[in-house]
Amino acid sequence: TGEHAPGVQAPLRDTFEMAHNALKAHGKAVQMLRAYGKQKLSIGFAPTASMCYPETESAEDIEAARKALFSLPDDPHNWTWNVSWWSDPVFFGKYPEEGLQKYEKYLPKITDDDMKLISEPIDIYGQNIYNGQCIRMGKDGHPEYVRRYEGFPKTAIDWPVTPECLNWGPRFLYERYKTPIYITENGMSCHDVV
């Protein structure tokens, strides 16, 4: 979007290529750490994404939240905060099929060697969790985003305050990726005086 430094708005195809190269760099870093580490290392990966949590603890709402978390948006300009696009290649050695179909015309050439490199085994999964979306099962059987009420708590930079995502996010991530989860970033911006 160009909102953050360096203020560049890259073409969509370039953003997918950048992401793919970042994942390849991650895989290469894992190889180098394993090859040259002087002791046994615990190596991880820490992307960031918006989590989803269920409106109620009904089985339907829980399944809807899980599905929403790992689904890819239809809008190709809104893929960057997605859990499965960044994490499935690392843990499963492949991009999500849903994303390959939705974003096909923007993707770089992806080789088997790329995916082997990207999926170098890791020991822990970090996730930067700041907020999330409340989800319920819609009447049509598809996940539905629950609209926030007027006056919903927000941080100083207008991020929603959603502590529920600190429970449900790691739970869903562990179910899918079967790797110890670390919350590597969390917090909220306030107008504090020290």
Named regions from a protein language model:
Residues 1-194:
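Active-site region of glycoside hydrolase catalytic domains
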